[in-house]
Amino acid sequence: MSWVLIGVAGAAGAVARLLVGAWIDGRPGGRAFPWGTFAVNIAGSLLLGLLTGLVVGRGWLAPEVKVVLGAGFLGAFTTFSTWLLDLHEALRRGDHRAAFVNAALSTGLGLLAAWLGLALGWGR
């Protein structure tokens, strides 16, 4: 497998994350909640589940495709570190409700999205 392909996919994922996050966070209403980070993480969970189901469950794609797209593109598209920084920032400014909602929704919907993607990809 080519590390270059993983790097190119990672670069594309990072740019996609930046564009999606900027588009969502740049909408009217300010940034009281980190919707951009939330959206890319939920979408990435769904897509990684789908990709895994298509590779493992159905065998429609080569395992190398899962590595390039999963570790490369989706690894750069999603962002655990920014999510944690957003949680820390909400706690630092005393907005415990926003931190709790972010943690609960991101975790719960992220798991649900991954499960749904896996079920769709697997064909169950």
From Swiss-Prot:
UniProt cross-references to InterPro entries, sorted A to Z:
FluC
Q: Name one Pfam family in it.
A: CRCB
Looking up PANTHER family in the UniProt record yields: FLUORIDE EXPORT PROTEIN 1-RELATED (PTHR28259:SF1)
- Key word Kinase present: no
Question: Which keywords are on file for this protein?
Answer: Cell membrane, Ion channel, Ion transport, Membrane, Metal-binding, Sodium, Transmembrane, Transmembrane helix, Transport
Name it.
Fluoride-specific ion channel FluC 1
Q: What does this protein do?
A: Fluoride-specific ion channel. Important for reducing fluoride concentration in the cell, thus reducing its toxicity.
User: Can you tell me where the transmembrane regions are?
Assistant: 4-24, 36-56, 67-87, 103-123
* Cellular component GO terms, alphabetical: plasma membrane
Q: Where in the cell is it found?
A: Cell membrane
Q: Which gene does this sequence derive from?
A: fluC1
Q: Which GO terms describe its biological process?
A: cellular detoxification of fluoride
Q: How, per the record, is this protein's activity regulated?
A: Na(+) is not transported, but it plays an essential structural role and its presence is essential for fluoride channel function.
Q: Which family does it belong to?
A: Belongs to the fluoride channel Fluc/FEX (TC 1.A.43) family.
Main location (coarse class): membrane
Please list the reactions this protein catalyses. fluoride(in) = fluoride(out)
UniProt cross-references to HAMAP family, sorted A to Z? FluC
Q: Which domain of life is it from?
A: Bacteria
Q: Which organism was this protein described from?
A: Symbiobacterium thermophilum (strain DSM 24528 / JCM 14929 / IAM 14863 / T)
Which is one GO molecular function term here? metal ion binding
Binding positions for Na(+) per the UniProt entry: 75, 78
Q: How does it sit in the membrane?
A: Multi-pass membrane protein
